Amino acid sequence: MPRVDPNLRNRARRPRARRGGGGGVGSNSSRHSGKCRRQRRALSTPPLTFLATTTTTTMMGVASTDDDSLLLKTPDELDKHSGSPQTILTLTDKHDIRQPRVHRGTYHLIQLHLDLRPEELRDPFQILLSTPLQLGEANGESQTAPATSQEEETAASHEPEKKKEKEEKKEEEDEDDRNDDRERGILCVVSNEDSDVRPAFSLFPARPGCHILRSVIDQQLTRMAIVRLSLNLFALRIITPLLKRLPLRRKAAHHTALHDCLALHLPELTFEPTLDINNVTENAASVADTAESTDADLTPTLTVRVRHALCWHRVEGGISGPRGLTSRISARLSETTAKTLGPSVFGRLELDPNESPPDLTLSSLTLYQDGILRFNVTCDRTEAPADPVAFRLRLRRETVRRPFFSDAPLPYFVPPRSGAADEGLEVRVPYELTLKNSHTLRIYRRFYGPYLGVFVPHNRQGLKMPVTVWLPRSWLELTVLVSDENGATFPRDALLGRLYFISSKHTLNRGCLSAMTHQVKSTLHSRSTSHSPSQQQLSVLGASIALEDLLPMRLASPETEPQDCKLTENTTEKTSPVTLAMVCGDL
């Protein structure tokens, strides 16, 4: 079995470089750094230019806690000696400008380790992957065998039928599910714990193109002989929360400043077949008509029909919900109806295209102890809509496999614009805010589900905000650090950052759940579990994720033929290069 280059292994365990322009770091490290300098001087290219296309790759299997077992292996050797897929790809500054090597494979983690001179960080440079990169399917890896010509012809003949069935299914689903692709992948770049350079914690959509990774350079680094840049690149599973449906909240007493604009009679409680939105296989009417249908197959559904002239009140938005014109409607339910609804009930609006404002949203939904159902509908406009207003409120018991909010996400959380490259919700300030000192912003929304919310700030001049992990069943609290003596002002609807919901399996540890973007570190470690005696995990921001629970990343050679890089619906759209470029600046 081939052994790793001893110089490379010594460098992996090297101590920190001593400060000073010519300070050594030990005999082995000094020889290695001198060798690197001689290699760089031998190249006739400008500084750092070779990094754009000549970053070489070295394959590495699952790391072990024993240093002697950290052997660099080729893909063939990994497949020969181990039946498990390749897990970690390690990129180092070992390179050959004349014959850059690009390896194919599927990995859960890509590590980059570069030893640079401080002066090499002055100019922007490309650091990672000039090769097609795509993500595996969120609900299963995309490593499938190539289809034969006969299979392709068969699939093509059935494609119109599948397309028609898919359109029929979409008609049965509500808007939340039509606009959602279920789990998707997003690339995450974070520095390793032994990195001297501090790149910002960054999330990038897995789309072709070059993404900018920004970093700060401490002045102390200029006095070091060798500066280490160490990065971890991996793909997180993300999922879009429910935005058009609200959970039915239950309260004992009614306290509100708004009066009921409309009081309805008792709606009829109907029973409808249970439909699995993730896998709709049968028509609802056909299921309801079958004699085999039982109470377990039927879901209680309450439909409140409204076609009436409503009175409207103006609200500014915030804790009470979205801003705009709001109308409150009530309906008294019988005790039997209220009990039959049971828990896990969600409500959504079904609009009439001719008599409903297109921007009408459900902003609150509450059932009180006295059996009165009250809900608010809101439209963001200055003038009241024309009368009458027609819509239906449908309450249904559902098993939700996505994050959902305690109240309407607006005006705090705004979905991305159609066609936007970024997948995260925009977090905005609902009103003008002026801060003189550092302040903690509390957003009065909770979310539910076995997920993690991650807030990535959009820092403005004169203030900074940390990357924050948002735990379920808690308010989202954001710390704003004001560095300008004159304070800082947030105009109305100012962008604070973006919010992502991580669906990768995770465990919480004692790490800090909040850190500035340039202070976020990641650690690769082993942990014993009931399923595996030594499971590789990656820890970042107080959460640990097993490598096998990360979305696999597939690398392909640039000369790969198009038919060998076919993509599924849940992968990137094109097999174009996904690259990262680093821009460094002073702290």
UniProtKB/Swiss-Prot annotation:
Q: Where is the composition biased (Basic and acidic residues)?
A: 155-169
Instruction: Name the residue ranges of motif: Nuclear localization signal.
Output: 161-170
Where is this protein primarily located?
host cell
Subcellular localization: Host nucleus; Host cytoplasm
Q: Which UniProt keywords apply?
A: Host cytoplasm, Host nucleus
Start-end of Basic residues biased regions: 10-19, 32-41
- Give the signal sequence positions: none
Q: Where is this region: Disordered?
A: 1-48, 136-185
Q: Which Pfam families match?
A: Cytomega_UL84
Quote the function comment for this protein: Plays an essential role in viral DNA replication. May participate in the DNA replication initiation by interacting with the origin of lytic replication, oriLyt and subsequently recruiting other viral/cellular factors. Additionally, interacts with and shuttles IRS1 viral mRNA from the host nucleus to the cytoplasm.
Family as reported in the entry's similarity comment: Belongs to the HHV-5 UL84 protein family.
Subunit structure comment from the entry? Interacts with the DNA polymerase accessory subunit UL44. Interacts with HCMV major transcription-activating enzyme IE2. Interacts with host HNRNPK.
Q: What is this protein called?
A: Protein UL84
**Which species is this UniProt entry from?**
Human cytomegalovirus (strain Merlin)
Its lineage opens with: Viruses, Duplodnaviria, Heunggongvirae, Peploviricota, Herviviricetes
